[in-house]
Amino acid sequence: MNQLNETDYGTPAKVSAQQVTLEIDGVSVTVPAGTSVMRAAVEAGINVPKLCATDSLEPFGSCRLCLVEIEGPDGRRMKGYPASCTTPCAPGMKVQTQTPKLADIRRGVMELYISDHPLDCLTCPTNGNCELQDMAGAVGLREVRYGDEGENHLSLKKDESNPYFTYDPSKCIVCNRCVRACEETQGTFALTINGRGFESRVSAGQMDSFMESECVSCGACVQACPTATLTEKTVIMLGQAEHSAITTCAYCGVGGAFKAEMKGNQVVRMVPYKDGKANHGHSCVKGRFAWGYATHKDRITKPMIRSKITDPWREVSWDEALQYAASEFRRIQAKHGKQAIGGITSSRCTNEEAYLVQKLVRTAFGNNNVDTCARVCHSPTGYGLKQTLGESAGTQTFDSVMFSDVILIIGANPASAHPVFASQMKRRLRQGAKLIVIDPRTTEMVKSPHIQADYHLKLRPGTNVALITALAHVILSEGLQSEDYIVERCDLQSYQDWQQFVLREENSPEAMEAICGVPAAQIRGAARLFATGGNGAIYYGLGVTEHAQGSTMVMGIANLAMVTGNVGREGVGVNPLRGQNNVQGSCDMGSFPHELPGYRHISDATVRASFEQVWGVTLDPEPGLRIPNMFDAALDGSFKGLYCEGEDIAQSDPDTQHVAAALEAMECIVVQDLFLNETAKYAHVFLPGSSFLEKDGTFTNAERRISRVRKVMPSKSGKSDWEVTVALAAALGYPMSYTHPSQIMDEIAALTPSFAGVSYDKLERLGSIQWPCNESAPQGTPIMHIGGFIRGKGKFINTQYFATDEKVTLRFPLILTTGRILSQYNVGAQTRRTENSQWHSEDKLEIHPHDAEDRGIRDDDWVAIESRAGQTVLRATVTERVQPGVVYTTFHFPESGANVITTDNSDWATNCPEYKVTAVQVMPVSQPSQWQQQYQRFHNEQQGLLQGDKVMSEPLVTK
């Protein structure tokens, strides 16, 4: 799909049941009521000159280029020359866009713009892609009567501070598009106009540089700029793109659509695709700019093998690497049994690639020892929503939030983890929706420009279930439940049992206040607001799932949505904000050890039979090992081999020293990745992976939206990830006959009811599809559970609160919770290899001023964080974002060792680790921890082995 040049309609589309017919330059056109004359003209094939107008922003009417002449239905001419961008169409209008008078006015306006603009077009980086240049040609400007006396642009300096784009004020025409984009699209309000008249210029904050300002580098201003004022540095360096392809972002679960603009096989820039249904032409700093990792010097592009992790790596051919891996896996199974090996799928890879890895494990390995990174993030979502609503996924589209009246955010900070969706949510909040935030920290969603939470329930980490039950207690005890909805849509016996449980006095806000640390009055106020405020939508993240009662909390959220009647229509719903680009898809594809694709249990003989017929093997009916079980089995000697595609378990999983010991105990680890990550340091075979720019396939985002990933450059290693898995399966004696990922999707559709109607042809036609997509929903399902729940009747489940085993003590008096930051992503393997590290180059520990003062800790001091699992050292950030008794850090840098501290506690139903609650002590120190010193030695040795050095490596385990 080459979409290098998209049509700009000048103003946003309007939705209306009423249609208006008018005449523009003699052409009859019918448009929805409220449509601007400018947009109607473009739809009629008539382009009106413009500079301040663009269809991603509300009309502004400042440039005066789009003036038109209008005659009303009564034949009277409208006074003056109205701006077509701000004038709505009316029935019977007759519009003239091209008259001698209009041409004269436009040339005069353009002449004024040009009089204070450098005329260096031939050497300008946007030459050939500049709207000012285009408009000068469109209006027929051939000369400028004004001399260059008094020009001020020559003295204005560029701002080069941002690593991704430049700001050249000399080329600014003060159209306000960048300022408006920052306000309307992004919602950061970082830009303004300083000065008056010819002195007017765009300013980031109070005349700060872009890097010093509140700018979050989303790129909306760069995208909106009609001149070279704001220009990507890659465009300056490489020149204008020659062709493009539409693909899908490989970062968070928003799954934004992008145009990869190319020059040959080189990416010039990534531009958010305005017809993308998940992101609507918006982006964040990661998707817009942080794609350089794909060509980073650290990429490993040749297969490598070694016998022991103390041996140097040896580059080999693909055939030798695959045969070596296959022979080692077969040797292990012959010696230790069929269950001694397993595989891990990747949530960064495509649906097709995840499907093939689980297929390889179940066919070539002959067991169900397959798992995915969702184990450590959203496995409780799959379990909890399946039990209550009947499907292991969120209920809504992202666009649904624009119809919400009350938004409840629990354990999530979309501004950091899902920033494009956060911008959409903020837009709705600025329009008047109410906001409740449940979070132990004060995040950007609690308070930011023009956003203020109505309630911030700042609970103690680990007490989610107590709080959600207390909210339900208020609703039931005050008669605020949606009785008709419950009777019609829900299982009444489960409701009555749950109602009896919730109404116990022990679940009242007054009783739970002592547990949660949230005043009862706040709990009551928030509950009343959610129950009575209209359409109520719940959005939650890892602050819900990564707890000992993560699954219980997910069920509690579903209970709250059902009791208030907030499932099954626009503006409501239960919406998990999934972290990685394809974590939803990897789960859909059967990456759990107990489920085949489509969340169907492996023990179901009928389900197994359908797969056995297509796959040509007999499947093991017993569920396999989860990731934590694999580690435990490795340490007891029964699990010896692992195929790990695109997942860094050594950095991302909890209790690092336990994980390291398990990896060292294995005899053959095959890692397939872009870089020699932390897990690869324990590997015996390295198979080079491919980035999202080097492959075809699909991703499924947090709203169940299946979108195409398109190959825009040759694979650095010569193979896409799906081709590597196919080749490994063949080496293991199980041939797979695919020549393109579309064939894999056809097989998925044939075997998976929720994907039955999905095909690459349909994706080409529709752009994207939200599953379920089948005979009953051939175009997909934007909103689930309309008219009835997938499971039949919604089921209420009692959510008894149990305190976590991880409790504060005299030795460990603080609670550590972990999370993410905007500029970095997951374990940082991609973003650390981009300029994003200029914003966040290390993990730091947030600590409240009271706790810091008690320990003699100042801002930026080195501090030791110790738990029962281990110790690491970080710099301190003293801040009131955290409450007293709580500390917080991120996990983006391996040397930080955030997961050295986290423990083996996990969710009771799914083994999702309890990352959000770890009892710790924090004290000032002057040197790295023992683990960090040992890590650095091990890292240096492994880098040496990559270069072919022979060294003796000590284990990365503190005995």
Region annotations inferred by a language model:
Residues 2-9, 64-217, 222-248, 263-267:
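Fe-S ferredoxin-like electron-transfer domains
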Residues 586-587, 592, 741-835:
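Long, low-complexity segments enriched in small/aliphatic residues
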Residues 398, 694-714, 724-733:
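Glycine/threonine-rich phosphate-binding loop and adjacent beta-strand/alpha-helix elements that clamp
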Residues 118, 175, 180, 236-695, ...:
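Catalytic alpha/large subunits of respiratory electron-transfer oxidoreductases
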Residues 715-775, 834-846, 850-959:
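Long, contiguous, secondary-structure-rich segments that constitute the structural scaffold
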Residues 22-23, 91-97, 207, 452-459, ...:
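Short beta-alpha connecting loops at secondary-structure transitions
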Residues 1-21:
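Terminal leader/tail segments of proteins
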Residues 37-71:
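A basic, amphipathic helix-loop patch mediating RNA/tRNA/ribosome contacts
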